Design a protein with these regions (language model features):
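FIC/Doc superfamily catalytic core
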Residues: 1-258
Length: 258
């Protein structure tokens, strides 16, 4: 991607997205449900263990703490997302994780490249010296009037895409971007107790090939990014989770009246 011409501009084919949005509307009750399936329970906050095997448990503990913070900070009517919020989320997610050249809650100061040949190639994140400017523009864009007119799911997926595009941290960009998207859904009235509808599993199934391939297609097209296919893919994942909530609610109702 050619960074000197980068802008927060995108296009969406509403006609192609109509079936996805209709499926989303069909499960709207589940989006605001207060009773959620047991597999959405938070992992307990644990005392940090020692040794190499500690990393997955530390990530789980940190994710729980970060989700708690996001859930308290972002509610309908709360103040818009800020760069300070993003840095706090990253700090909470990265606590006690030893990552070379990274201080939790700070933007990277070195170049970064991500990707794989089998998933479309490699992507260079925003130039480090431009990150403070790009991140300021990012929060202005995400908190602006235009994204707020879109359905909440699309708004959150825009936030995810552009965050991943900038890749502002050495590590933890995926986890942070999903919680940024979660924050937007919270503000727009969704109950996302599980953290962006557990989209991590959906995005990264089959080694994340489809997810990364769609991202690279968008990046290779350049500005304005055609996000139709990526947004459709993301909505599919949200609908999949909402269906499981609907099934759970129906089961609870049957038991209540049975």
């Amino acid at each position: 991607m050619y960074w000197p011409s980068f802008e927060f501009r995108y296009s969406l084919d509403r006609r192609k997205l109509t079936p996805h949005l209709m499926a989303l509307d069909a499960h709207q009750q589940a989006a605001t449900a207060l009773v959620l399936p047991h597999h959405w329970n938070r992992p307990p906050a644990e005392t940090p263990p020692d040794g190499p095997s500690a990393i997955p448990r530390l990530k789980s503990r940190n994710a729980a703490r970060a989700r708690d913070w996001v859930g308290e900070r972002f509610v309908p009517g709360s103040s818009p997302l800020t760069l300070a919020d993003i840095l706090t989320i990253h700090r909470l997610l990265s606590e006690d994780l030893s990552v070379e050249h990274q201080t939790p809650g700070t933007l990277r100061v070195d170049p970064v490249q991500v990707g794989r040949a089998e998933a479309g190639g490699f992507h260079s994140g925003a130039p480090a010296e431009r990150l403070p400017i790009y991140m300021r523009r990012y929060v202005e864009f995400i908190a602006g009037n235009e994204p707020a007119t879109l359905p909440p799911a699309i708004h959150s997926l825009l936030a995810h895409f552009f965050f991943t595009t900038l890749h502002p941290f050495v590590d933890g960009n995926g986890r942070t971007s999903r919680l940024v998207a979660t924050a937007i859904l919270y503000q727009r009235g969704y109950n996302v107790h599980g953290g962006f509808y557990a989209l991590s599993d959906y995005f990264y199934q089959n080694d994340g090939i489809r997810y990364h391939t769609l991202l690279h297609r968008c990046w290779q097209q350049g500005v304005p990014f055609d996000l139709t296919e990526f947004v459709g893919f993301g909505i599919e994942g949200i609908v999949m989770e909402l269906r499981s909530i609907d099934s759970f609610i129906r089961m609870k109702l049957r038991r209540a009246v049975g």
